[in-house]
Amino acid sequence: MANPPPTSGRARLIRGRRPSPRDNADISKSDILKVRRQEADAEAAFASVLREAVEAVERAGYRFLVLGGLASSLVGRPRWTHDIDLLVRPDDARDVLAVLRTAGFSTEETDPVWIYKAFKRDVMVDIIFMVMGGIYLDDEMLSRSIERDYDGLRLRIPSPEDQIVIKGIVHREETSRHWFDALAILGRADLDWNYLLHRARVGARRVLALLIYAQSTDILVPSWVIGRLYEEVYGP
């Protein structure tokens, strides 16, 4: 006969009696409620810190875009993210970090090549000034950026095309979420394919792989786009 499943210490100690299935059910409900409260608290803290960070940098007059899982969820698939990514110009990175420090964030100059970090109420803000592949916040990306609403806060985020290129380039095995974020945007956004091709040149081989895979899963990617990008990588 198989041994019965172990029970928690709390269940075993209820008035010295043998635990019943109802005890375990009650504990499960309690645990679920606790997790839900924690999730609600985390979401509230995230929204509050996001607002504080965005409004502080806006008041200081620096140009930036919200990047990462939050940005992609506003044009693609809903996805919870635990941190905030701000894409800034390299020359502004230290100043933006100082703005957040003045606003009550703890800060660190994490890596002088591409990222600084700020923290408040267990929420991390990544101040990114160079994306893998040598992508920077430039005038063209800013001019193509769009506004979306998040919890009553207007956020400026990269265009769907720029997000696809960025996600396709930064994708690695341990960060597969970027790949699936890009696929969701490909499947849901009305894209300017010529602009996407133009921006994809910085990482054409990776973006080509993404588009071929997307087309193989019946996401509508025009064959001429794949053909043009193939020529960019391998020649005519």
Which residue stretches match the model-derived regions?
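Compositionally biased terminal segments of proteins
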Residues: 2-236
